[in-house]
C-alpha cells in the first residue's frame, strides 16, 4: 500500500515533467539543439514505444575504498524491487527508454526512481542479438533519509544485452561515506 502510494506520487511528478515535452512541435533537424533533440526523443518514446520493459534490480555495491567498514557492513546490497517501462530503437540502432522502478535502498527503505534513458548501442559480433551500450539517464528519485523530497538525477548508463534481455548498470558518484554506489538491474523487453 505504502509503496503503491509512493509510486503513484512520483509517477504523477514525472508525468507533469514529461507532458510539456509532448506538446513541443517537431522542428527541422537543422534547427534542433541538444535540448530539442532530447525532448523530441522523450516525446517519441512516450508516443511510439516499440517494447514494454520489465526491470528487476539485481545488485548495489558500495565502493569499499569510499566507505568506513562499519557502514558497508550494515548496508543492504540486494535491492529487491521491480520496475516497468517502454522503449524503442531509433534508426541508428540506439536505445531510448522511459521507466519507473522502486527498490530497497542501502538502508532497506523503498526508493522510487523514474526517468528517461538513452544508450548508444554497438553490435560488435555478426550476431545482431548481442549488443553493448553506453549512455545516460535523466530522471527523479526520492529517498527515505531525505524525507522523500524529489531529487533530480543525471547518471551514466552502460549495458550488455542479448535478444530481449539486458544487464544495465549505473554508478552514482559521491564523497566519502556518501554515494559511490554501483547499481545494476536486468531489463527484459516484451
Curated annotation (Swiss-Prot):
Subunit structure: Homodimer.
Positions marked as site (Role in lipopolysaccharide recognition): 71
Any one annotated GO CC term: cell outer membrane
Extent of the signal sequence: 1-29
Chief subcellular location: membrane
Broad class of enzyme this protein falls into: transferase
Catalytic residues (positions): 62, 105-106
Keywords for the protein's UniProt record, in alphabetical order: Acyltransferase, Cell outer membrane, Membrane, Signal, Transferase
Catalytic activity: a lipid A + a 1,2-diacyl-sn-glycero-3-phosphocholine = a hepta-acyl lipid A + a 2-acyl-sn-glycero-3-phosphocholine; a lipid IVA + a 1,2-diacyl-sn-glycero-3-phosphocholine = a lipid IVB + a 2-acyl-sn-glycero-3-phosphocholine; a lipid IIA + a 1,2-diacyl-sn-glycero-3-phosphocholine = a lipid IIB + a 2-acyl-sn-glycero-3-phosphocholine
Gene Ontology molecular function, alphabetical: acyltransferase activity
Gene3D superfamilies: 2.40.160.20
Annotated positions for site Role in the phospholipid gating: 176
Protein name: Lipid A acyltransferase PagP
Gene Ontology BP term (one): lipid A biosynthetic process
NCBIfam families, A to Z: PRK11045.1
Primary role: Transfers a fatty acid residue from the sn-1 position of a phospholipid to the N-linked hydroxyfatty acid chain on the proximal unit of lipid A or its precursors.
Similarity comment text for this entry: Belongs to the lipid A palmitoyltransferase family.
Origin superkingdom: Bacteria
EC number(s) reported in the record: 2.3.1.251
Localization: Cell outer membrane
